[in-house]
A protein has these predicted regions:
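Conserved, hydrophobic alpha-helical core segments of structured domains
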Residues: 311-318
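Intrinsic disorder at enzyme termini
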Residues: 6-30, 404-502
Length: 502
């Protein structure tokens, strides 16, 4: 169960995260390393923005013709011998998965990394019918032992150090294991090898599905996905409906963008293309392959001019690494399966109760770093503004904030009214100004002054100073530099004639 489902708000989760010094340090260190790796990889490749635009155009075209490419993929996948299922909701996808497990009389399922599986809460569903689900990605395995959810799309256990991991694995081993990376990885490798050999079903996600051949492509660094797709007799692939690309030639662009954006690699250690179940001449592979194509709210974005580009996402995690908010609070503070800027937009899109996730759109500074990092140029910062606007239009906005903005508009809409308010502010601030600073933490100043200092209103405003300049310009008693006087005189003439000056 997520933090949001337990009743915590975004603010409460963020406050908890900000109070966790280790979490902030670990997330900041790892995201900075990933961000720098991506930057260097992009610079080394060259023409990066051109490649981003190529990727964007491929995704725009694919999503605009999604029904065509989904049908093409399904037809070709079935021709290859795979069983293709379409699930409108998370509940349908889970029901299909459980039915396959029951038909196979499965006792255990080995899984490679899949955010869609997390989205469906599939492990809990499998456990409810007595099927053991084992995560085989190292980070996911650690998170599973800790009974937690991933806090990063690419690095699920970004919030844990090796000493914490050693404690989890020692409990699993029944003996104390040293906090040595090689020893810990060796233990997990041995443990999982037994699970691979005993598993009845292998379950994967899908990085890209190739419509022209009905193939699926998986990117990974550990080799566990290869084991998942070759050892068990039955394979289930969970695939968000937007994972389609038209052709293998399009994969060249995506294979250039995804690894560099995710981890700074030219290419992941393993890239597997899977086309149907095992054939007679194949040495390994599943006897049965099931592909579950999942909607779960995705189709609601189709045709929406503000949010359709959300479906362009290739799940690289670059926006998380660039986001100053994510780098301070980590992933769990967002409360859903997906975190960071993409999660702040995608979570409300996938959840039925949008109002429950209203505040998540405020977990952003709107700086646009996510857009600059995105390999397919998704304008996430604009989408966050759209979400905020829709919340207000639906009558779910903060009443005090709405009243304050209306008051601000009234004041700023009239110069005389603005000057009068400033004069009142100068009088009122005398009660709280100390040494030129306002440090009180009450009312609207509480949030700001907790971490910063509000400067006092200056004695002379810009308007006051400009009025003095005009007086000096037209006064014989106060001589002015002739060159300055000439420029100001021309400026004043232009203002009178409706110009803007040079």
């Amino acid at each position: 169960m997520s933090a949001a489902e337990k009743g915590q708000t975004v603010k409460e989760r963020a406050r908890d995260a900000l109070g966790n010094d280790f979490l902030r340090s670990a997330v900041r260190f790892t995201t900075e390393r990933l961000r720098l790796g991506k930057k260097l990889a992009a610079e080394e490749h060259g023409n990066w923005d051109d490649w981003r635009e190529r990727g964007r155009q491929i995704r725009l075209h694919t999503i605009a013709h999604l029904d065509y490419y989904l049908n093409e993929f399904a037809e070709n996948a079935r021709a290859n011998g795979a069983h293709v299922h379409f699930a409108d909701t998370a509940e349908e996808a889970v029901a299909i998965s459980l039915e396959i497990a029951k038909h196979a009389s499965a006792k255990s399922v080995v899984k490679s990394k899949s955010m869609v599986s997390e989205e469906l809460h599939l492990n809990q569903a499998l456990d409810s019918i007595g099927v053991e689900a084992i995560e085989t990605d190292l980070g996911e395995y650690i998170i599973q032992l800790a009974n937690e959810t991933p806090s990063h799309i690419i690095i699920p256990a970004i919030h844990k150090n090796r000493h914490q991991i050693a404690g989890l694995l020692s409990r699993e081993a029944g003996e104390d294991l040293p906090a040595d990376t090689a020893v810990l990885a060796g233990f997990v490798r041995t443990k999982l090898r037994e699970k691979f050999l005993a598993a009845d079903i292998g379950m994967t996600g899908c990085n890209f599905a190739i419509a022209e051949t009905g193939s699926m492509v998986l990117f990974e660094n550990e080799g566990n996905a290869r084991m998942v797709t070759t050892v068990p007799k039955t394979q289930i692939t969970l695939m968000g409906m937007e994972r389609i690309i038209p052709s293998w030639s399009d994969l060249e662009v995506m294979a250039t963008l995804l690894p560099r954006s995710a981890t700074g690699q030219k290419l992941t250690v393993y890239m597997s293309g899977i086309t149907g179940p095992r054939r007679e001449q194949d040495a390994d592979g599943p006897d049965q392959m099931h592909i579950i194509i999942i909607d779960n709210g995705r189709s609601l974005q189709l045709g929406d001019p503000e949010f359709q580009e959300l479906l362009n996402c290739i799940r690289c995690g670059a926006c998380l690494n660039a986001c100053p908010v994510y780098r301070h609070i980590g992933g769990h503070a967002y409360g859903g399966t997906y975190s960071g800027p993409i999660g702040a937009v995608l979570t409300p899109a996938l959840k039925k109760n949008v109002a429950e996730w209203d505040d998540i759109a405020n977990a952003s500074s709107l700086c646009g770093a996510c857009y600059e990092a995105c390999p397919v140029k998704i304008p996430l910062h604009d989408m966050l503004v759209y979400l905020r606007r829709r919340k207000v239009e639906a009558g779910r906005g903060n009443k005090a904030e709405t009243l304050g903005m209306k008051g601000f508009s009234v004041v700023m809409g009239n110069a005389k009214r603005y000057r009068n308010v400033v004069r009142l502010g100068k009088l009122g601030q005398k009660l709280v100004v100390r040494n030129g600073e306002i440090r009180v933490r009450i009312g609207p100043l509480k949030g700001w002054n907790t971490y910063r200092v509000t400067p006092e209103l200056p004695k002379d405003s810009f308007w006051d100073r400009w009025s003095k300049v005009e007086q000096e310009l037209h006064s014989d008693s106060m001589p002015m530099n002739p060159e300055v006087a000439d420029r100001l005189s021309k400026l004043m003439d232009q203002r009178k004639n409706g110009g803007h000056g040079q």
